[in-house]
UniProtKB/Swiss-Prot annotation:
InterPro entries: bHLH_dom, HLH_DNA-bd_sf, MXD1_bHLHzip. One of its GO terms (biological process) is negative regulation of transcription by RNA polymerase II. Residues 192-202 have a biased composition (Polar residues). Residues 28-67, 176-202 are annotated as: Disordered. One of its GO terms (molecular function) is DNA binding. Gene3D superfamilies: Helix-loop-helix DNA-binding domain. The keyword Cell inner membrane does not apply. Efficient DNA binding requires dimerization with another bHLH protein. Binds DNA as a heterodimer with MAX. This is Max dimerization protein 1. SMART domains: HLH (SM00353). Disulfide bonds: none annotated. Transcriptional repressor. MAD binds with MAX to form a sequence-specific DNA-binding protein complex which recognizes the core sequence 5'-CAC[GA]TG-3'. MAD thus antagonizes MYC transcriptional activity by competing for MAX. SUPFAM superfamilies: HLH, helix-loop-helix DNA-binding domain.
Length: 221
């Protein structure tokens, strides 16, 4: 009786272990077959471990190979981007990385200076824009003042032209009046001269007749 009871207890323990293992495998997402006994189970464990170790080792080797190939490709690209000088083929990986680091530092400094210059130019642009707007307002004001002054000047010029025309009319009238007066005076003088001459002629003719009457010899001649 004791032997069958021990066998039953062993089977119950194995069944319990199997159930616990199935629960753990269900939690992790995988399952395994129920071993027939502990020896077979141990053998399967050893085989699975050896297979896993060989698989992991080959996977690691493949990953390392890919990593080194990617690193070589990156170093070749880095040689193109970083200025190395005439002896670029003799540089080691360490010297290449050191030069790349210093080159990156220079690029960062240049980028900072460029950003500072851009900000300064933007400030100058805003200042010039404000000045341009101010000059535009000032120009508009000066144009309005200039147009007002030109209109006033044109009005004053028209007034001066009117005054000049009126003074010219007065001057021509005075000239006409003086010329008419001078012509009248000339006519008067000419008439007086003619009358004087006629008087003188009349008197001279009278004197001649008197002389002829006094001297009959002259008449006979």
């Amino acid at each position: 009786m004791a032997a069958p009871v021990c066998v039953n207890i062993q089977m119950l323990l194995e069944a319990a272990e199997y159930l616990e293992r199935r629960e753990r495998e269900a939690e992790h997402g995988y399952a395994s077959m129920l071993p027939y006994n502990s020896k077979e189970r141990d053998g399967l464990k050893r085989k699975s471990k050896s297979k896993k170790s060989s698989n992991s080792r080959s996977t690691h080797n493949e990953m390392e190979k890919n990593r080194r190939a990617h690193l070589r490709l990156c170093l070749e690209k880095l040689k193109i981007l970083v200025p190395l000088g005439p002896e670029s083929n003799r540089h080691t990986t360490l010297s290449l990385l050191t030069r790349a680091k210093s080159h990156i530092k220079k690029l960062e400094d240049c980028d900072k200076r460029s950003l500072h210059q851009i900000e300064q130019l933007q400030r100058e642009q805003r200042h010039l824009k404000r000045q341009l707007e101010k000059f535009g307002v000032e120009r508009t004001r000066m144009d309005s003042i200039g147009s007002a002054m030109s209109s006033e000047r044109s009005d004053s010029d028209r007034e001066e032209i009117d005054v000049d025309v009126e003074s010219t009319d007065y001057l021509t009238a005075d000239l006409d009046w003086s010329s008419s007066s001078s012509s009248v005076s000339d006519l008067d003088e000419r008439g007086s001269m003619q009358s004087i001459c006629s008087d003188e002629g009349y008197s001279s003719s009278g004197l001649k007749r008197i002389e002829l009457q006094d001297n009959p010899k002259i008449t006979a001649l």
